A protein has these predicted regions:
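Conserved, structured core segments of small domains
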Residues: 1-93
């Protein structure tokens, strides 16, 4: 299991809007591997500034390939992406 942490470029809202439909299609196509995810925000009611996605991938390379195919990554929305091994410990699982 891996956590994918993405941070947007400043002022990337127009790019998010441009690639949103393709990004949502990408998420749907890959839903068997995506355990959960959603936007990161600086304030609860603020704009998206990134994303956190937890995926069921066997290797870091598989998780990196998955995010590399995301239209938000390909379209220049994300300034940085980190892929880290993740272990769920709470709640018990």
């Amino acid at each position: 299991m891996y956590a994918i942490i993405c941070f947007d470029h400043a002022n990337s809202a127009p790019l998010r809007d441009k690639h949103r439909a393709a990004h949502q299609d990408f998420l749907k196509r890959n839903s068997p591997r995506i355990l959960y995810g959603g936007p990161l925000k600086d304030a609860a009611d603020g704009p998206s500034t990134g994303a956190l996605i937890v995926v069921d991938c066997a290797t870091r390379e598989e998780a990196e390939a998955l995010v590399a195919a995301d239209p938000f990554k390909q379209g220049g929305v994300y300034a940085s992406v980190a892929v880290r091994a993740f272990k769920k410990v709470f709640p018990q699982g």
